[in-house]
Each structure stands twice: as C-alpha cells, then as structure tokens.
C-alpha cells in the first residue's frame, strides 16, 4: 500500500496560472483510511484516538493550512462528518474538500477517480484530478517476497518482474482512467493538478543513482540484500510522458537526499 497521509504535492501541468497565482493556495492529498473509521487492521484503531479519528483528520488538514484537499478512502458520500468537523468556510465536491467554490465535473466510481473544478479568487479555475489506483500486485511487496525466498536474486531480473506486474492483463491500477481527463485538460490548456494514492512508487525515486547511493527502502530488512534498484514504474512514466511534473521532485531534485517516502507508518 502506498497511502498518502500528509503528502502536500501531486503532479501538475501549469498552462494558465503563473507562479504568483499558484502560490495563493495550498493543495493537499490525504488518504484518511477506511473513511476515517476504525482502521485497526492498518494500525489506526479508534481506541487510539478517543473513539474517532475524524477530529484528528480535520486537525491535520488545518495544521497543514490546506485550502484544497483531495481525499482518498473518504467518508460515505452521504456523510459530512469530515466537512462538519472542518467547519465554516469549507465545501465539498465529491472527495475534494475546498475553501473555494468547487464543482464535480466527472467521477468514475469503479476506478475511484474524480475531476473537480475549483474557482480561485479572481475567477481563476484550476482542475483537480483525485485518484486512488488499485493496490493489486503492489511492486515493493512483490520485491520483498522474492527477496525473502532468495536474497541472492538478480536485482535486474527482479526489477523487470515488479515493473511488468503493474501493467499485465488484469493488473493495471487505473492508468488510462486517470490519463484521459488529464490529457483532455492539457489539450484545453487548463491548469491541472493530480493528487491521489497511486499504490505504486515513482520512477523518479527508484533511479540508478538511488540504487547506488540510497538507503535500504525496507525497514528492518531481514534478507541482507538492500531493497533498492532501478525501476521504470509505469504509472509515473505515463504521467511524465503526457507532460505532468512531479512537484515534490521539482523542488527536491536529489532523490537520495530527499527520497519520496509515502508509506503508511505501520508498513516497512
């Protein structure tokens, strides 16, 4: 699972707004895990939070001073618990919460994707694409499994296996469903931001440089073989190919000094 807990950046294509306008709002992506309910199976039981996590989730959003938040694993569409906890000044368009007026343009429930237009000050509109890709055949878990079975496995072969698993028949995560509205917005020269839980790492993190110089990605690795090798993860490659820019990597260009770690805390 590659769940974003407090990960403030997504992928962005900027065609209409300049840097000055973009600096006027803060965008956040946040997987709140199982609708903010009792997520004990992933280490977030309600008993740790006084019976409910909703107030802590709202507090985290406020602490981040976010203006727009793409939520994954949101509360039920019929429930406004989080919206109510955020308080006055917030509205909701599907799973996108905003201090600015927001309108749901498109949703695909099968692939947990929503397209939302947000109107900033001065009638400037940005498009937010919020996605949650399927977790099946999660590459790092597969790599851990292979390393446990054979710590001396050829890492180049292992990289090929985990890369191909994401795109094999029945194993895609939601790439095309996400790419389509992005390409449409880019063609229309809109300012667009992609946020989400991608359930897949980025090729900008799993580089040759990181494979040589980075730390072991596997906390308490029992195999003796560091989990670090070059992988051209297909999802992030596809996004880069259509012109999207990883905003985290744009500002933090050294993936060894600033690795893009987005693991949920209980996981290695």
Locate predicted features.
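Bacterial N-terminal signal peptides
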Residues: 5-13
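Proline-aspartate-enriched helix->loop->beta-strand connector
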Residues: 57-61, 65-70
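A short, structured active-site edge motif that brings together acidic residues
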Residues: 90-97
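Glycosyltransferases and closely related glycan-assembly transferases
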Residues: 81-87
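Short beta-strand and adjacent tight-turn residues that come in two discontinuous sequence segments
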Residues: 71, 92, 249
């Amino acid at each position: 699972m590659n769940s974003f807990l407090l990960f403030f950046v997504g992928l962005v294509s900027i065609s209409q707004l300049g840097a000055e306008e973009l600096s006027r709002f803060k965008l956040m992506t946040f997987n709140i895990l199982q609708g903010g309910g009792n997520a004990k199976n992933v280490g977030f039981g309600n008993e740790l939070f006084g019976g409910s996590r909703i107030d802590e989730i709202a507090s985290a959003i406020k602490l981040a001073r976010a203006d727009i938040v793409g939520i994954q694993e949101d509360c039920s569409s019929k429930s406004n618990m989080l919206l109510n906890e955020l308080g006055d000044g917030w509205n909701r368009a599907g799973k996108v919460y905003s201090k600015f007026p927001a309108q749901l343009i498109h949703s695909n429930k099968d692939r947990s994707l929503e397209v939302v237009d947000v109107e900033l000050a001065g009638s400037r509109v940005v498009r937010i694409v919020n996605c949650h890709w399927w977790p099946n055949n999660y590459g790092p878990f597969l790599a851990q499994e292979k390393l446990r079975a054979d710590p001396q496995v050829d890492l180049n072969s292992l990289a090929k296996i985990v890369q191909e698993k994401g795109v094999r028949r029945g194993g895609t995560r939601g790439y095309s469903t996400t790419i389509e509205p992005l390409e449409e917005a880019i063609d229309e020269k809109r300012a667009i931001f992609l946020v989400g839980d991608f359930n897949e790492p980025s090729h900008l993190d799993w580089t040759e440089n990181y494979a040589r110089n980075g730390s072991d990605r596997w906390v308490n690795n029992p195999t003796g073989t560091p989990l670090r090798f070059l992988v051209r993860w297909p999802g992030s490659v596809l996004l880069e190919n259509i012109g999207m820019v990883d905003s985290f990597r744009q500002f933090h260009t050294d993936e060894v000094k600033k690795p893009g770690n987005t693991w949920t805390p209980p996981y290695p």
